[in-house]
Amino acid sequence: MTTFYTVISWLSVFGYWLLIAGVTLRILMKRRAVPSAMAWLLIIYILPLVGIIAYLSFGELHLGKRRAERAKAMWPSTARWLSELKECQHIFANSNSEVASPLFQLCERRQGINGVKGNQLQLLTTTDDTLKALVRDIELARHNIEMVFYIWQPGGLVDQVAESLMAAARRGVHCRLLLDSAGSKQFFRSPYPAMMRNAGIEVVEALKVNVFRMFLRRMDLRQHRKIVLIDNYVAYTGSMNMVDPRFFKQDAGVGQWIDMMARMEGPVATTLGIVYACDWEIETGKRILPPPPDANIMPFEEETGHTIQVIASGPGFPEEMIHQALLTAVYAAREQLIMTTPYFVPSDDLLHAICTAAQRGVDVSIIVPRENDSMMVRWASRAFFTELLNAGVKIYQFEGGLLHSKSVLVDGQLSLVGTVNLDMRSLWLNFEITLVIDDDGFGADLAQVQDDYIARSALLDGELWNKRPLWHRVTERLFYFFSPLL
């Protein structure tokens, strides 16, 4: 009996170390950034069992077998659709401004299509304006409405959107609603899913979360896009979730969330439509490719319209596209670069690009909220401040609530607006969407909004920052080490 227990003990020890060695080898064999690999190895060696479970759950980007098969199966038809779209030569821009050309060239070569012209574009900077405009557009819808959001939380003006959407479905408009399971958990626990389905709306819970799915796909892979499409002509996207900030996270102690959305009319709705169609097919297996733009029924404002490129990221889309786009935009800056983000945990490459821009004379400003709803991100982001300040970057801490807008403005001409935070999760993992706009008129509108943010912010003083307590520095460095995993 003693020999039996001895053998079992030795086998357990051998299996334990074999498991650690196997996971270590897997981490080293994966093509990932060195800081990310080192962070995972440290967790596994300090807390082996917890670290291994965490790595298998969150350490690798896998969509799940069923969704991966759907993503693979949809691309032949999607490629044919893109080929047909290219035949609509009248919607594509033939030239871009000097500052925007490198980014538009990158997008064309990696995504297969150029930016589309002839769009009307309106920047909405308050939730009230956005939701009221959305209700009006829903009431005018005749054919189809598609929506995808990370968070849909009932309450306030959001309920008016829900009622107008159900009314549209009852009068025969084909309505589809795709919501992230984790972000919209309160919605799926409310009466609204049943009410909407009874009204005729297709409601889909994306990337469902439960303990039994932990080892089937990465659980922190989220559907983070915010898109509304109406009649394949009107479109919305930006940073705003389907929430009324007067009722959302009021106990978080960060104030109301501040967002921006872009409302568009024109052929850009078609390019956003193909992104939505891909998401819908990956989640449901149903194919809903949008019709190509029809010049006979869709008015094109070629002389005054905006040129817009759509960048989509996530499993099944071009790898590192968002990251490459941001790097290209930063390196294109010659005079001014302004960035707003709620979560600032950049990659080493992006941090280096921002600092280099400031060091070569570009006026660089970053606007972040003073208070944050994520303690880990709050401390991790501050670990980058010293390097940014030393490079000459101006850091503004917004004091009027949780600044949730995500925007980049380069030389007053090139704008990026969408759902992407400047953190690892948005850059490498989630389903995200970003608009790239080459237009000085829209740039002026965005600059006005950013100036308003700056007016409601406090400029971080480098001397005072260097006098912060030692325990602050230690905490920042601790969370900085785990920043590749945030």
Swiss-Prot record:
All copies of the PLD phosphodiesterase domain together span 219-246, 399-426
Family matches, as InterPro entries: Cardiolipin_synthase, CL_synthase_A, CLS_N, PLD-like_dom, PLipase_D/transphosphatidylase
UniProt keyword list: Cell inner membrane, Cell membrane, Lipid biosynthesis, Lipid metabolism, Membrane, Phospholipid biosynthesis, Phospholipid metabolism, Repeat, Transferase, Transmembrane, Transmembrane helix
* Main subcellular location: membrane
Active-site residues are 224, 226, 231, 404, 406, 411
Q: Which GO terms describe its molecular function?
A: cardiolipin synthase activity
Catalytic activity field: 2 a 1,2-diacyl-sn-glycero-3-phospho-(1'-sn-glycerol) = a cardiolipin + glycerol
Topology in membrane: Multi-pass membrane protein
Q: Does the keyword Repeat apply?
A: yes
The yes or no answer to whether the keyword Transmembrane is present is yes
| Chain's role | Catalyzes the reversible phosphatidyl group transfer from one phosphatidylglycerol molecule to another to form cardiolipin (CL) (diphosphatidylglycerol) and glycerol.
Q: What family is reported?
A: Belongs to the phospholipase D family. Cardiolipin synthase subfamily. ClsA sub-subfamily.
Name assigned to this protein = Cardiolipin synthase A
Q: Where is the organism placed in the taxonomic lineage, from the top?
A: Bacteria, Pseudomonadati, Pseudomonadota, Gammaproteobacteria, Enterobacterales
This protein's gene is called clsA
